[in-house]
């Protein structure tokens, strides 16, 4: 019974994943996960690529003719397209042909979070339980550092199990040691694992990195991953600016009792399906975990 409850929960959408009038459009996209990821990847330019001057001067690269992309475009368009619906609406506004042939000038510049929630949204539109997941991945550069990253997790009904998939990394110039459509769970460091690993001195703080400018390392980075993932597990895929206000106000310097509260949350998140009801209880009864800071508050 609990399993059915969980699967039904992750078929539901949030203000970030609801596609509104674009639900039927998404429902008719390819069912094959590889085709779906490649198609989605070709609609998007990662902001890190857009800000690279060498890439910006290329007429023929993976991203397309980058010389035709106006320099006035925002590097990080996550600011203006925070929801899956807004991403699809902008893509179709620029060019209604949603194909792998989309020109660079008609793509949007968003990060892994948008890739993760967009894929989750499309899968939900097809009636497939799906959720965005936040954490850290060493496979971004294979240099020993785990960079903050978002991926998608969905339930494979045929195999009766959850799968991890990374739409953002479907790039031909990035070779992986595993299948991006079925990522081994030990290859992705979820927010809770990173947080507890730092608390227990399992990880060198310098190897857990949140890609702000300047970068945030260690415990403070892991707290971000912890809360991004907790909210995602509750179908609330908050944007990067959102973080519990009490933590932001304290500049991520907490009392030991407050860290112990997070220890409890993180330990439950290690097995989010088994502890789903307990996580929902925390969600419903500890408002400080949900009162967010943002750009204007």
Outline where the language-model segments fall:
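Secondary-structure boundary elements
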Residues: 2-106
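His-Asp-centered catalytic microenvironments across diverse enzyme cores
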Residues: 5-14, 37, 41-46, 56-73, ...
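A short, structured loop/turn motif at beta-sheet edges
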Residues: 31, 124, 157-159
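Active-site neighborhood of thiol-dependent amide/isopeptide-bond enzymes
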Residues: 69-150
């Amino acid at each position: 019974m609990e399993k059915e409850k969980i699967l039904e929960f992750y078929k539901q959408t949030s203000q970030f994943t609801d596609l509104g009038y674009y639900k039927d459009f998404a429902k008719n996209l390819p069912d094959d996960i590889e085709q779906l990821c490649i198609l989605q990847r070709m609609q998007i330019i990662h902001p890190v690529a857009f800000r690279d001057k060498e890439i910006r001067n290329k007429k023929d690269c993976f991203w397309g003719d980058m010389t035709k992309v106006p320099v006035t475009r925002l590097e990080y368009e996550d600011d203006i397209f925070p929801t899956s619906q807004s991403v699809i609406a902008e893509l179709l506004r620029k060019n209604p042909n949603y194909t792998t042939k989309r020109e660079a000038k008609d793509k949007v510049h968003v990060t892994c979070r948008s890739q993760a929630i967009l894929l989750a949204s499309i899968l939900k539109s097809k009636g497939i339980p799906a959720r965005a997941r936040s954490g850290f991945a060493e496979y971004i550069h294979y240099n020993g550092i785990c960079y903050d990253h978002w991926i998608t997790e969905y339930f494979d009904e045929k195999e009766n199990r959850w799968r991890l998939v990374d739409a953002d990394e479907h790039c031909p110039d990035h070779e992986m040691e595993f299948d991006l459509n079925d990522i081994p769970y030990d290859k992705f460091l979820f927010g809770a694992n990173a947080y507890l690993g730092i608390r227990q001195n399992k990880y060198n703080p310098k190897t857990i990195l949140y890609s702000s400018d300047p970068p945030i390392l260690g415990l403070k980075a892991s707290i971000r991953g912890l809360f991004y993932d907790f909210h995602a597990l509750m179908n609330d895929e908050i944007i990067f600016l959102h973080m519990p206000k009490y933590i932001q106000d304290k500049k991520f310097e907490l009392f030991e009792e407050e860290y112990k509260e997070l220890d409890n949350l993180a330990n439950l998140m290690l097995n989010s399906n088994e502890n789903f009801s307990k996580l929902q209880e925390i969600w419903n009864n500890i408002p400080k975990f949900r009162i967010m800071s943002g750009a204007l508050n």
